[in-house]
Swiss-Prot record:
<feature type="binding site">
    <location>
        <begin position="107"/>
        <end position="112"/>
    </location>
    <ligand>
        <name>dCTP</name>
    </ligand>
</feature>
<dbReference type="GO" id="GO:0015949">
    <property type="term" value="P:nucleobase-containing small molecule interconversion"/>
</dbReference>
<dbReference type="InterPro" id="IPR033704">
    <property type="entry name" value="dUTPase_trimeric"/>
</dbReference>
<dbReference type="GO" id="GO:0008829">
    <property type="term" value="F:dCTP deaminase activity"/>
</dbReference>
<keyword id="KW-0378">Hydrolase</keyword>
<comment type="function">
    <text>Catalyzes the deamination of dCTP to dUTP.</text>
</comment>
<feature type="active site" description="Proton donor/acceptor">
    <location>
        <position position="133"/>
    </location>
</feature>
<feature type="binding site">
    <location>
        <position position="152"/>
    </location>
    <ligand>
        <name>dCTP</name>
    </ligand>
</feature>
<feature type="binding site">
    <location>
        <position position="176"/>
    </location>
    <ligand>
        <name>dCTP</name>
    </ligand>
</feature>
<protein>
    <recommendedName>
        <fullName>dCTP deaminase</fullName>
        <ecNumber>3.5.4.13</ecNumber>
    </recommendedName>
</protein>
<comment type="subunit">
    <text>Homotrimer.</text>
</comment>
<dbReference type="GO" id="GO:0006229">
    <property type="term" value="P:dUTP biosynthetic process"/>
</dbReference>
<keyword id="KW-0547">Nucleotide-binding</keyword>
<dbReference type="Pfam" id="PF22769">
    <property type="entry name" value="DCD"/>
</dbReference>
<comment type="pathway">
    <text>Pyrimidine metabolism; dUMP biosynthesis; dUMP from dCTP (dUTP route): step 1/2.</text>
</comment>
<dbReference type="GO" id="GO:0006226">
    <property type="term" value="P:dUMP biosynthetic process"/>
</dbReference>
<dbReference type="InterPro" id="IPR036157">
    <property type="entry name" value="dUTPase-like_sf"/>
</dbReference>
Length: 186
C-alpha cells in the first residue's frame, strides 16, 4: 500500500473529480492552511456546524440519536464551548477510487490549541462530503474558522483492488451531503 504524492492527487482531482472543489496550491498566509500539499490534501471546514448541547437534558445514544442533542449554527467563526463537541462538514466533495483508502488527521494548528479533529477513513468507492468531528478538550471556548483548513487527508492505494467497495455494499453514509448525524441500519 503506497502513500500518494501531490502529482497523483492533482491528476485524480482534475481528471477524475476525486476532490471538488480542488485547490492546487497550499494556501496558508493569514489562514489555517488548506489545499494541496506534498503527500496529502488539507481540507476546509464549511460554514455549517452542529454543536452539542445539554439544554434539553438528553442522552447521546449512537443507536437512537436525537436532533435535540445539537444546535445548528452557520457562520464564518464557530465557537465550540469548553469541553464540548461539534460536527461540521468539508467544503470538498470526495469520490474515492475503488483501490484507494484515505486517512484524515487533524492539523497541528488546532491540535496545539486543544482542538482534536476526528474523521473516519474514506473507504474505497465512498462518495460524499466528509462529516468532521471536532472536540474542544480545553476548559475555554475555542474558535473554528469556516472556509479554512481543518485536517489533512492522506491517500493510500492498495496493492490490489478490494472485492467489495463502500459503494458496492451501499454504505449508510454513501453520497452524503451536509452534516450527517449518526445512522444505524435497521
Amino acid at each position: 500500500m503506497g502513500l500518494k504524492a501531490d502529482n497523483w492527487i492533482r491528476k485524480m482531482a482534475l481528471e477524475h473529480k476525486m476532490i471538488e472543489p480542488f485547490c492546487e496550491a497550499n494556501i496558508g498566509k493569514g489562514v489555517v492552511s488548506y489545499g494541496l500539499s506534498s503527500y496529502g490534501y488539507d481540507i476546509c471546514v464549511g460554514r455549517e456546524f452542529k454543536i452539542f448541547t445539554n439544554v434539553n437534558s438528553t442522552v447521546v445514544d449512537p443507536k437512537n440519536f436525537v436532533e435535540e442533542n445539537v444546535v445548528d449554527f452557520e457562520g464564518d467563526v464557530c465557537i465550540v464551548p469548553a469541553n464540548s463537541f461539534a460536527l461540521a462538514r468539508t467544503i470538498e466533495y470526495f469520490k474515492m477510487p475503488d483501490d484507494v483508502l484515505a486517512i484524515c488527521l487533524g492539523k497541528s494548528t488546532y491540535a496545539r490549541c486543544g482542538i482534536i479533529v476526528n474523521v473516519t477513513p474514506f473507504e474505497p468507492g465512498f462518495e460524499g462530503h466528509i462529516t468532521i468531528e471536532i472536540s474542544n478538550t480545553t476548559p475555554l471556548p475555542a474558535k473554528i474558522y469556516a472556509n479554512e483548513g481543518i485536517a489533512q487527508v492522506l491517500f493510500l492505494q492498495g496493492d490490489e483492488k478490494c472485492d467489495t467497495t463502500y459503494k458496492d455494499k451501499k454504505g449508510k453514509y454513501q453520497a452524503q451531503t451536509g452534516i450527517t448525524l449518526p445512522r444505524i441500519l435497521k
